[in-house]
Amino acid sequence: MSGGKYVDSEGHLYTVPIREQGNIYKPNNKAMADEVTEKQVYDAHTKEIDLVNRDPKHLNDDVVKIDFEDVIAEPEGTHSFDGIWKASFTTFTVTKYWFYRLLSTIFGIPMALIWGIYFAILSFLHIWAVVPCIKSFLIEIQCISRVYSIYVHTFCDPLFEAIGKIFSNIRISTQKEI
């Protein structure tokens, strides 16, 4: 193994491999291999969802959390029969629960489809139209900003500096006459 050449068991000569540590995608180095296996990429399309906590970012805490007590309340001194109050509570709660389930069954998947398309369009436009347009504008505006900077430093700075020197020697004194 001298001069950058390797000899295999059959006596054939070959050049030094480009990377002796192994394949750049599957390293032979054990420590390197452990680092690669530790870094797992999580795909947003295959992640598991939490069926218990369905609002982990608390988007709807102050808007949708409406209970019976938030909508219907009887002030002190004006109470209906206890049975009516219990039946009203049960009716409200069960109706809200099942009607929400019915609406989400009928409209949930179509609305998810519509919002998925909408946000896909927004993402597409942002990635392929908005950001390139802004970058293009910033590149084009640099030329104008350089010309403007030269104009300001050449004409405006000396003019305003001269005006400042003229007015810097003006002294105002006030006197009170009684």
Swiss-Prot record:
There is a cross-link at residues 5, 26, 30, 39, 47, 57 (Glycyl lysine isopeptide (Lys-Gly) (interchain with G-Cter in ubiquitin)). The modification N6-acetyllysine is found at residue 5. It is found in: Golgi apparatus membrane; Cell membrane; Membrane, Caveola; Membrane raft. The modification N-acetylserine is found at residue 2. Residues 105-125 dip into the membrane without crossing it. Coiled coil: none annotated. This is Caveolin-1. Pfam families: Caveolin (PF01146). The N-terminus of both isoforms are blocked. Phosphorylated at Tyr-14 by ABL1 in response to oxidative stress. One of its GO terms (molecular function) is protein-containing complex binding. The modification Phosphoserine is found at residues 2, 9. Homooligomer. Interacts (via the N-terminus) with DPP4; the interaction is direct. Forms a stable heterooligomeric complex with CAV2 that targets to lipid rafts and drives caveolae formation. Interacts with BMX, BTK, CTNNB1, CDH1, GLIPR2, JUP, NOSTRIN, SNAP25 and STX1A. Interacts with SLC7A9. Interacts with TGFBR1. Interacts with CTNNB1, CDH1 and JUP. Interacts with PACSIN2; this interaction induces membrane tubulation. Interacts with CAVIN3 (via leucine-zipper domain) in a cholesterol-sensitive manner. Interacts with EHD2 in a cholesterol-dependent manner. Interacts with CAVIN1. Residues 2-104, 126-178 are cytoplasmic. The lineage of its organism: Eukaryota, Metazoa, Chordata, Craniata, Vertebrata. PROSITE patterns: CAVEOLIN. GO terms for biological process: angiogenesis; angiotensin-activated signaling pathway; apoptotic signaling pathway; basement membrane organization; calcium ion homeostasis; calcium ion transport; canonical Wnt signaling pathway; caveola assembly. May act as a scaffolding protein within caveolar membranes. Forms a stable heterooligomeric complex with CAV2 that targets to lipid rafts and drives caveolae formation. Mediates the recruitment of CAVIN proteins (CAVIN1/2/3/4) to the caveolae. Interacts directly with G-protein alpha subunits and can functionally regulate their activity. Involved in the costimulatory signal essential for T-cell receptor (TCR)-mediated T-cell activation. Its binding to DPP4 induces T-cell proliferation and NF-kappa-B activation in a T-cell receptor/CD3-dependent manner. It comes from Mus musculus. Residues 149-160 are annotated as: Interacts with SPRY1, SPRY2, and SPRY4. Adipose tissue, lung, heart, skeletal muscle, stomach, small bowel, kidney, spleen and testis (at protein level). One of its GO terms (cellular component) is endosome. Residues 82-94 are annotated as: Interaction with CAVIN3. Residues 2-94 are annotated as: Required for homooligomerization. InterPro entries: Caveolin (IPR001612), Caveolin_CS (IPR018361). It comes from the Eukaryota. Residues 131-142, 167-178 are annotated as: Interacts with SPRY1, SPRY2, SPRY3 and SPRY4.
